[in-house]
Design a protein with these regions (language model features):
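Acidic helix N-cap motif at the loop->helix transition within catalytic regions
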Residues: 9-13, 37-46
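Short, acidic, metal-binding catalytic loop of nucleotide-sugar glycosyltransferases
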Residues: 16-25
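A conserved acidic beta->alpha catalytic loop
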Residues: 32-40, 80
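Short aromatic/hydrophobic "clamp" motif used to bind/position activated sugar donors
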Residues: 73
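Hydrophobic helical membrane-anchoring modules
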Residues: 165-220
């Protein structure tokens, strides 16, 4: 399942990869927040079921998940990049997966910059020590477990962290699958400046700051 908002310039590759593994991916759900570009036509062209509603990643993921009553749900971002062999790695994870747990991937930026590797290591530390994977690492979760947790939190920002906290440390585990993601924001803002801003937002959220206020700051 993929939340989208004007992602026509990059979502095609991800949809093509998923649609190319029909024995593994039974259904693709795109939950759109009001795209004005060709996102929806691209999604439908790849056979995706489209859900529409107000923008906001938490709400979009929540609406999309409500369309899936059973089975495993793989939450992805529109800029996620699946590496060669991803289908086999996902199949191996599913073969031994516990429906009472959720699984996250290993972050990899689409950049050869050495600073990208440092930020990736910091993300790995966050997952190992805090068990707080971000949405750009993807999350594989069973529909029944997600429903038992009252679905994806309807937040403008930090819905991934809020869901991870609902799951708790014991119900989160890594999977042996690299998830590529765009480095555009880090290249624009500066690798360490962006990483520091993300850390500050995380700490503010954990301290109880309103996610809507954090989302406004995030867009600046």
């Amino acid at each position: 399942m993929i939340p989208t908002l004007d992602e026509g310039h990059r979502i095609g590759a991800l949809l093509a990869a998923l649609a190319g593994a029909p024995a593994l991916v039974a259904r693709i759900v795109v939950s759109d927040g009001g795209s004005a570009d060709d996102t929806l036509s691209i999604a439908r062209r790849h056979g995706a079921d489209v859900v529409t509603g107000p923008p906001g990643r938490g709400g979009q993921l929540r609406r999309g998940a409500e369309r899936i009553a059973d089975g495993w749900i793989w939450l992805l971002h529109a800029d996620s990049e699946l590496p060669p062999g991803w289908a086999g790695a996902l199949r191996d994870t599913l073969a031994r997966a516990d429906p009472g747990r959720a699984y996250y991937g290993r972050l990899r930026f689409a950049s050869g910059d050495v600073r990208a590797r440092i930020v990736e290591r910091l993300a790995g530390w966050r997952c190992r020590v805090l068990r707080l994977p971000y949405g750009d690492q993807s999350l594989l979760i069973h529909a029944r477990l997600l429903a038992a947790l009252d679905g994806v939190p309807d937040l403008k920002l930090m819905e991934d962290v809020a869901l991870a906290r609902r799951l708790g440390r014991r119900r989160l585990a890594p999977m042996d699958l690299v998830i590529g993601t765009s480095a555009r924001a880090y290249q624009r803002d500066g690798w360490f400046r962006r990483a520091a801003r993300n850390l500050i937002r995380l700490l503010l959220f954990l301290a109880g700051r309103d996610p809507a206020r954090l989302a406004k700051a995030y867009r600046r």
